[in-house]
Amino acid sequence: MRVVFLDNRDSFVYNLVDLCTSRGAQVDVYRNTTPMSVLTAALEPTEAEKAAGQRPLLITSPGPGHPREAGCLMELTAYALEQRIPTLGICLGYQALVEACGGQVAPVGPTHGRTDRVLVTKAGAEFAPLAPCVIAPRSGEQAPYGWIDVARYHSLGSRELPAQLVSLAHSRDDVVMALRHASAPAVGLQFHPESILTPAGPTLISALFTFLTQEA
């Protein structure tokens, strides 16, 4: 599988690239200053991919600031949704999915380098890629669908989603931590799956690769 990886100038980028390659992906990295014409060409399937019925996967990385200030991130995210390119947005990339669908990203309080136990929603419990990562609640815990331990490094986020996005998990103060698009092959993670503070990260990335390539 080929991944077109948009680097939003974050210190975690190559940890994430290494995680993807460890899952068997060929990863081509582009900075968010790359011209859109180069990126759209990279996202076109090769002849071999066409013959196999495959498309490359777009991953948009974490990064500093607001997604609307991150080079071509917003334009590329909107293009990927329109063209139904399988897309995984992580942290800043997740926020770009929210904004591209008409939602708003706003300050939610700094949570840099913190492990958090996030609650899975009913939709998350029904989302196959999350299933192997969910820890079942113990008796008396207020987590009817289970929870996941994740690494959070962000100060912006979203507590409400536009209609076409579905919350899969949220923090205890209702900041959305994972989403999927209702009709396009796109998933967003506000947390960092590549961090050692997200124990199920490698399992989740493998499951998302399978899901997104099948949905394309």
Predicted features by range, described:
Residues Q54-F127:
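Cysteine-nucleophile active-site neighborhood
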Residues P129-S183:
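Catalytic beta-strand/loop cores that center a nucleophilic Ser/Cys/Thr
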Residues M36-Q54:
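Short amphipathic alpha-helix with an adjacent loop that forms part of the alpha/beta core around
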Residues V13:
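Active-site-adjacent helical/loop segments in soluble small-molecule enzymes
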Residues M1-V4, P56:
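Extreme N-terminal starter segment of soluble prokaryotic enzymes
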Residues L19-A25:
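A short, Lys/Arg-enriched amphipathic alpha-helix followed by its capping loop at the start of a domain
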Residues Q26-T34:
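A short beta-strand-loop structural module common to alpha/beta enzyme folds
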Residues I196-A216:
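Acyltransferase
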